[in-house]
Amino acid sequence: MALQLYNTLTRQKDIFEPIDPANVRLYACGPTVYDFLHIGNGRMLIVFDLLFRVLRDLYGADHVRYVRNITDVDDKINARAAERGIDIRVLTDEMTAIFHEDAKALNCLPPTVEPRATEHMAEMIAIIEKLVANGHAYIAEGHVLFDVPSMPDYGKLSKRPLDDMIAGARVEVAPYKRSPTDFVLWKPAKPEEPGWESPWGRGRPGWHLECSAMSWKHLGEVFDIHGGGIDLVFPHHENEVAQTCSAFGHDVMANVWMHNGHLQVEGQKMSKSLGNFLTIRDVLKDWPGETVRFTMLKTHYRQPIDWTLSSLRESQRELDRWYPVARAFDQINPDNIPGIPSSFRDALQDDLNTPEAITILRRLYKDALETTDYAGVHLLLCGKLLGLFDQSLEKWKNWKPASFTVENVTFEDLIKEREEARAAKNWPKSDHLRDVLASYGIVLKDNKDGTTSWEAKR
């Protein structure tokens, strides 16, 4: 079947027709590097890594260009660097390196290009100059702002009427704005802040402008697919569309817009106040990256996902069963094997239908146990297309939580901590500690007298 993708712009699944099949172009909004990324950011990384893999499988690895940016100029970055008393570049380099480690642990392929916002000031200034020249931007009190009413179809991505946006604007609107909906393209920089010389004085760009400049530089004025989290549809992606289309005179910036759904934790919105805020690094301390990835893929990318310990536990169990079967076929000559089953490719080409693809993996595993021809090697090949089975069987079996050692006293301390959590009826912590120990091969048994015994199973 032909690749079909749900397009936020059209609100339907469209058959994907690249502008140039020999140069398929994909852009995804990357991180603002001021802190550790949370697990919801991890979902976005995995979703668009999967899309990158599917496009490479369909068009050839040399014919797909994936750009995922680094935002390294932002108010949050300035504030965090000041808080820590370090140079901004030191902070952004440190957090970018940590981000790369997290992405690698989740088995995400490196993008073709990973541009930094600070390296694209010339492109940003050029776009602003175009917008001012053609009447879509104006200068006011050292700022340059996009004139939203000058674009008749503003709101076409988010499907928000302009009148509703004006009514919903904050009561306190900067006095230099012509319309409450106008947004900043360039703003003055304080002496202690990073800044760049421009025709409008020393300053720095607005957030939305950065992605317009980087996508233009590396993918062109119009490209195939733009992606990100659902929270970016408005205002970030809407404003990208406004800037780029108004600057270059096209009706679209990207032909397809894709957005992954929200993530919640144990049925609740993730927040620091609830104590359930999880960074990618937090999760990777207790679970293998492939387990995290597999858990994400079990839910269709457009649906909300409920991040639970039980779902992680089940993913770990499935991969523990599948790994020995899949990796048993490492040495087989691929030239002697029929290609990936068409049903598996069809599932992924149906708007990245990973739940259906995983159902097929389960069927292949069952068939492999019954010695069906090629089922085991198909399990391996299909899993690899999802970004699974990337390790040797020995490495998979020997994985241990990074924060623990193998000495019994460590286990006893954890078991005691869990008993205290149970006594305090802190069930989430109790379940978490049980899962950590289980991933390390320690199986607990809660006794009637309130104590807990354990045995090593792995």
Curated annotation (Swiss-Prot):
One Gene Ontology CC term in the entry: cytosol
Catalytic activity: tRNA(Cys) + L-cysteine + ATP = L-cysteinyl-tRNA(Cys) + AMP + diphosphate
SMART domains for the chain: DALR_2
Motif 'KMSKS' region mapped to chain: 269-273
Cofactor note: Binds 1 zinc ion per subunit.
Chain residues that bind ATP: K272
Keyword annotations from UniProtKB, A to Z: Aminoacyl-tRNA synthetase, ATP-binding, Cytoplasm, Ligase, Metal-binding, Nucleotide-binding, Protein biosynthesis, Zinc
Name of one Pfam family that matches: tRNA-synt_1e
Its EC number(s): 6.1.1.16
Motif 'HIGH' region per record, residues: 31-41
Cofactor: Zn(2+)
GO terms of molecular function: ATP binding; cysteine-tRNA ligase activity; zinc ion binding
An example Gene Ontology biological process: cysteinyl-tRNA aminoacylation
SUPFAM superfamilies membership: Anticodon-binding domain of a subclass of class I aminoacyl-tRNA synthetases, Nucleotidylyl transferase
InterPro entries on file: Cys-tRNA-ligase, Cys-tRNA-synt_Ia_DALR, Cys-tRNA/MSH_ligase, CysS_C, Rossmann-like_a/b/a_fold, tRNA-synt_1_cat_dom, tRNAsynth_Ia_anticodon-bd
Gene3D superfamilies (alphabetical): Cysteine-tRNA ligase, C-terminal anti-codon recognition domain, HUPs
Domain of life: Bacteria
Principal cellular location given in the protein's record: cytoplasm
Annotated S-S bridges: none
Residues involved in Zn(2+) binding: C29, C211, H236, E240
NCBIfam families named in the record: cysS
PANTHER family, per the entry: CYSTEINE--TRNA LIGASE, CYTOPLASMIC (PTHR10890:SF3), CYSTEINYL-TRNA SYNTHETASE (PTHR10890)
Family: Belongs to the class-I aminoacyl-tRNA synthetase family.
Assembly with partners or alone: Monomer.
Name the UniProt record assigns to this protein: Cysteine--tRNA ligase
Organism of this sequence: Beijerinckia indica subsp. indica (strain ATCC 9039 / DSM 1715 / NCIMB 8712)
Gene label: cysS
